[in-house]
Amino acid sequence: MGARVLVATTPGDGHVNPMVPVAQEMVSRGHEVRWYTGKAFRSTVERTGARHEPMRDAHDFGGMPREEAFPQHAGLTGITGMIAGFRDIFIEPAADQMTDLLALLEDFPADVLVTDETFFGAGFVSERTGIPVAWIATSIYVFSSRDTAPLGLGLPPSSSRLGRLRNTVLKQLTDRVVMRDLRRHADVVRDRVGLPRIRKGAFENIMRTPDLYLLGTVPSFEYPRGDMPPEVRFVGPFVSPAPPDFTPPAWWGELDSGRPVVHVTQGTVANDAERLLLPAIRALAAEDVLVVATTGAPLELEPMPANVRVERFIPHHALLPHVDAMVTNGGYGGVNTALAHGVPLVVAAATEEKHEVAARVSWSGAGVHLKKRRLSERDIRRAVRAVLDEPRFRVHAARLRDEYAARDAVVDAVDLIEGLV
């Protein structure tokens, strides 16, 4: 007899999409799956065979631009923007999420909770009820370590004596000064629902360690740590299933013309075209490459240089086998998917979290991290040429591709989740 599985995800593409194949696999194994997330994702949920449970008390911002869902974030950048996002998008809604989930459990007594790592309401429910919770990671590893600097600084790891001293000093500075208000807000939200304070670091102060923390990557793309908890497992990337109805555009045959193909994308959320998309197009206009740009949303981009092809969306499973380099803002899912295809990267991170992704691209040797907030066309052009012309980037990307290919993230994840039941 199958288990009762309650999935809960933040109502955003980057949180819902990695869960899709996991939910499908659980349904295919005979488990009864209900999935609590935003109304905008009802059809996505139902296609997996799970039953959609809409948000009620919790803030449902699914399908809304961030500036509309959180107008108070307008103009915020850097660490300030990261703190505001973590506070308002993930910490503040946790109490209402808990209320919704507890109401669902009265009708559906779940055996296990499966959630993305920033859906903290599920952690509250686990603490209240004892139901085990598994995290499906949608981004980099978030727990602090003696071997790494605090999240958001984009610094490489160091386990040397001096490196650990650096990490300790920076952690104390971050927790006591930079992130002090964020830690206090986590205390307030836990107080609100009657849970004791945890007294941990800035990004760990909101909920206890889950029963499983399933990282959607491989060890070679995450910093080594000597103090990683046993609940953490590497399973490989959670890649969404290919859409069944993709029709290639008329220019598709040009991908095999012999010119290097450069894919430029800003992902599904950060879509300020002047931040990366248009500068990259202008930077590569005179290069002997074919540029395939995806906008993620309708944009007025004409006229385009002769070597540029623009589409709103192209499935990565169809495009990436033809791509020689990818220029991206550092979305975790897109980066892992590119590396799973052996595609080296140029990453111009839009946020502090994405700077951490970009730092791992650089550390792993699979691409270039453009650290400037204001990018020149020359910066982008030089980075793309380096990735195309220097074999070392493709060698490291190919090494990661082979490591990814040895994993079956979905099967391994569901096997581990079943072990909690």
UniProtKB/Swiss-Prot annotation:
Catalyzes the penultimate step in the biosynthesis of rebeccamycin, an indolocarbazole alkaloid that inhibits topoisomerase 1. Has a wide substrate range, including staurosporine aglycone, EJG-III-108A, J-104303, 6-N-methyl-arcyriaflavin and indolo-[2,3-a]-carbazole. It is an enzyme of class 4 (lyase). It catalyses: 4'-demethylrebeccamycin + H2O = dichloroarcyriaflavin A + beta-D-glucose. This is 4'-demethylrebeccamycin synthase. Transmembrane segments: none annotated. It comes from the Bacteria. One of its GO terms (molecular function) is lyase activity. The lineage of its organism: Bacteria, Bacillati, Actinomycetota, Actinomycetes, Pseudonocardiales. Keywords: Lyase. Its EC number is 4.3.3.5. It holds the Pfam family EryCIII-like_C. Pathway: Alkaloid biosynthesis. Belongs to the glycosyltransferase 28 family. GO terms for biological process: antibiotic biosynthetic process.
